[in-house]
C-alpha cells in the first residue's frame, strides 16, 4: 500500500496490483483510530481514477468537517 495523498483524517491510497483487486485506488476516512473505505476506484477501467479519487477525497473532507463541527456544537 502506498499513500498518494494524506489530508489528515482523509487519505488516498494505492493498494497495488489492479488485476487482483476490485479497487486499487481507495479514498479512506479515519474514524476511531481506524481507516475505513469511503470510495474505491479501479484504475484499469477508469482512466480518471486518480482525479476522481482526489475529488472524492474533497467530498470526504467536507463530510468529516461537518461531522466534527456538528459534534462540537452539541
Where does each model-flagged region fall?
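Short N-terminal "domain-start" leader segments
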Residues: 1-30
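Mixed-charge, Lys/Arg-enriched low-complexity segments
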Residues: 32-74
